[in-house]
């Protein structure tokens, strides 16, 4: 999987704008959480849909960016968490064991 690193709040406006052309997926990962590591591993082993951009956010290193994601897209912060953005809005967010590529892919159509 070719993640795009999400490490600045300035990227959020570009993600929002790009979501009008194709879905944008943000995966918020905690390097201190075994559940987050398991969710990351499951995503990286899955076949990656080509009709979306996938962003990786290390929320320990970039907590302020994680907070900005929650505020910008009006989602409650969780870790791990996956967020799908379409047409400038969050259309799906899930956390912990419910994070699967099949569920993400279902939101991309």
Predicted regions mapped to residue ranges:
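Non-catalytic, surface beta->alpha helical segment in thiol-disulfide oxidoreductase systems
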Residues: 86-109
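N-terminal leader/targeting and pre-domain segments
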Residues: 1-21
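Local sequence-structure signature of Cys/Sec-based thiol-disulfide redox active-site neighborhoods
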Residues: 16-46
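Amphipathic alpha-helical interface surfaces
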Residues: 36-39, 65, 69, 100
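Short helix-capping segments at alpha-helix termini
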Residues: 48-50
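Thiol-based oxidoreductase modules, predominantly thioredoxin-like and allied folds used
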Residues: 52-66
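A structural signal for the main folded, soluble domain(s) of proteins
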Residues: 12, 37-44, 71, 92-95
């Amino acid at each position: 999987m070719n993640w795009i690193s999400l490490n600045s709040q300035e990227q959020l406006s570009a993600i929002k704008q790009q979501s009008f052309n194709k879905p944008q997926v943000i995966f918020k990962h905690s390097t201190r959480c075994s559940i987050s590591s398991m969710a990351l591993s499951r995503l990286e082993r899955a076949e990656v849909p080509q009709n979306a951009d996938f962003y990786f956010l290390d929320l320990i290193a970039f907590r302020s960016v994680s907070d900005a994601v929650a505020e910008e897209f009006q989602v409650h912060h969780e870790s791990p968490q996956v967020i799908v953005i379409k047409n400038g809005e969050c259309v799906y967010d899930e956390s912990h064991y419910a994070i699967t590529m099949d569920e993400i892919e279902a939101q991309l159509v």
